């Protein structure tokens, strides 16, 4: 592990913790909400978190490329390192007061994820990993589960924003695995889904329609916790491909085999749109206040 990566880990940790604290300050207040496209929300909290993270990263690493969900790419494309930032992964959850959202900061060297920091906004947990150094939650080592049978597994997935318009919408896969496992969850934050695969609380994760900022950090967490991350067919994962399969390793071959057998369900219903403006008569949604009592243990 190079000194350059360790420096970036420290700065990413600082940025994630400060952004998490900032996002918690919005809890209990009201949020101005926009709908970028059906089901895809952005709030003032997203933008404030992104501004804070960008300020910290630019101050320390002006030469690095930065790709964020809200602002796109910044910096020289010739940079050796590229940051993948989701300032609020789980915006819809956050806007509704559902406590499952995260700050996700990943780092690529070339096209390879080498560093990941994920801060659970509501619980305050801090997940960190660097290639070759293992993975931690609140500075304590984490490992994937040893579940070796699909029938004993708990999986997690998600659905893309275009799920109403395409037959390749993950509905068939969701139904398929629901019958084969102890359950399939839909968390609403890819970063936290992957973090919980890394801790062993979930055994596997698959999803399509992903962006690099959704998964860059989580990929490193799962790998460094002893898990496996690939494309659906087992080939090396590309963070820009939009598809991902992650598991504890024990289940990976079985998950690949089952995914290959699933046929998409036909889209037989049109998207129903309310003719009224989004969130008519309320410019913002209330977010329930949650009290936090968290402490980051220093090494």
Tell what function each PLM region has.
Residues 33-34, 58, 73-76, 118-119, ...:
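Short secondary-structure boundary/capping segments
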Residues 77-136:
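DPxDG-like acidic metal-binding loop motif
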Residues 143-299:
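An extended, acidic
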Residues 1-88, 250, 257, 266-299:
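N-terminal subdomain of lithium-sensitive/metallo-dependent phosphomonoesterases centered on the IMPase/IPPase/PAP
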Residues 23, 46, 57, 91, ...:
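Residue-level signal for inorganic ion chemistry
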């Amino acid at each position: 592990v190079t000194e350059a990566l360790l420096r970036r880990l420290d700065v990413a940790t600082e940025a994630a913790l400060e952004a998490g604290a900032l996002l918690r300050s919005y809890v209990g207040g009201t949020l101005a909400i926009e709908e970028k496209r059906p089901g895809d929300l952005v709030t003032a909290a997203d933008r404030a978190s992104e501004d804070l993270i960008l300020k910290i990263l630019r101050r320390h690493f002006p030469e690095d490329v930065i790709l964020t969900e809200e602002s796109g790419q910044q910096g020289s494309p010739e940079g050796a390192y590229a940051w993948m930032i989701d300032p609020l992964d789980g915006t819809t959850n956050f806007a509704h007061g559902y406590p499952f959202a995260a700050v996700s900061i990943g780092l690529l060297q070339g096209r390879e994820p080498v560093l990941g920091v994920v801060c659970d906004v509501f619980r305050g947990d801090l997940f960190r990993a660097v290639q070759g150094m293992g993975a931690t939650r609140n500075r304590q080592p984490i490992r994937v589960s040893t579940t070796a049978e699909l029938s004993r597994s708990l999986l997690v997935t998600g659905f893309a924003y275009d799920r109403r318009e395409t037959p390749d919408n993950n509905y068939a896969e969701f139904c398929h695995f629901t019958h084969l496992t102890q359950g399939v969850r839909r968390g609403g934050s890819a970063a936290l889904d992957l973090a919980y695969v890394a801790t062993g609380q979930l055994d596997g994760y698959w999803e399509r329609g992903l962006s690099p900022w959704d998964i860059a950090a989580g990929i490193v967490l799962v790998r460094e916790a002893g898990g496996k991350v690939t494309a659906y067919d087992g080939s090396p994962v590309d963070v820009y491909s939009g598809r991902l399969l992650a598991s504890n390793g024990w289940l990976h071959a079985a998950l690949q085999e089952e995914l290959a057998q699933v046929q998409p369900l036909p889209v037989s219903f049109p998207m129903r749109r309310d003719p009224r403006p989004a969130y008519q008569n309320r410019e913002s949604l209330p977010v329930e206040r949650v009290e936090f009592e968290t402490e980051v243990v220093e090494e």
